[in-house]
Structures are given as C-alpha cells and as structure tokens.
Amino acid sequence: GMSDFTYYRITSTPHTDSYEDTVEKVRYLVKDSIERQIVSDVPVCTFLSGGIDSSIVSSVCAAKLKEQGKQLHTFSFDFKDNSIYFKSNAFQPEQDRPYVDMMVAHIGSDHTYLTCNYSDLADYLYTSLESRDMPTMADVDSSLLYFCSLVAKEYKVVLTGECADEIFGG
C-alpha cells in the first residue's frame, strides 16, 4: 500500500558567515564538487557556452586536468548562419561565441565548435519530446540532444553548467 511520511524538514536559519567566508566556502564547495566529477577512467570534456556556469565548470576542470598533464577538450554549439540571423532578445541578449573564445584562451582548452542546421534540429524534435514526455521551451532540448549525439562519438563523460543559471546568475 501507500504511505505518507516526511523524508526531511527544511528549516531557515540566519546566515551569520562574513561575506569573505561565504565566498570562500562557495568557492570550495563548487570546486570540490566539480573535481569529484572528473575522477574517471575515460576522458572527460565540458560544454562551454561562455556563460558564468559553464565557464566555472570548464575552468575548474581545465586546471585540475593540467595538474595531471592533460588538456581539457571543450565543445560549444551554434546554429548554421547564426551570425547572420541572430536577433538579440531577453533570453539571449548576445551571441555566445565571443565569450567562448575568451574562455578558451583563458583556460587553454582544446576547443571544438559544433554547428547544427535546421533540418538536423528538426530530426531531433520528436525524440526530445518523447524523452521528456512533454513539450518544452523552443528548441533547447532538441538541440542539446543533437549536440550530445555528436559529442558521444568521442566522449562518454561530459560536464556542463546546465541548471546552474539560477544559482550563479548565468
């Protein structure tokens, strides 16, 4: 049968750490959580959009791999002719590529730009809908699924900044 019980109880307490201590604690927790994910018996890569979240993940990974004498491989994604047809909006005020280029230069990654045309994207629309079992926002899921299928040919472990926007304002 079914039963109803509480797994946990969230309580709110005042944050008493100083700003400096908070910054250091968050830095430690983020770095530690990323470094734990790159312990792997197969090569690891990252998705790099140039935003805050993927830049943090890629930067930490690149530094850790450099300590091991390895170079991080990063991937970014764009749509064919995006530089021609791009229109700024609230969701994406600028193109990603200039920020990707800055991060690649900063962390020294081996970077690959992957491009998707609209027919490839259309091929993944139904699969992405079926995977989520519901419609989602624009082409985000279908494009991610398409690009993951390309990266999966070389890498089995990929770290991303997905879902960190809400935490870091990316």
Indicate where each model-derived feature is located.
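Non-catalytic substrate-recognition/targeting regions of SAM-dependent transferases
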Residues: 1-9
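ATP-dependent adenylate-handling active sites, centered on carboxylate activation for C-N bond formation
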Residues: 9-170
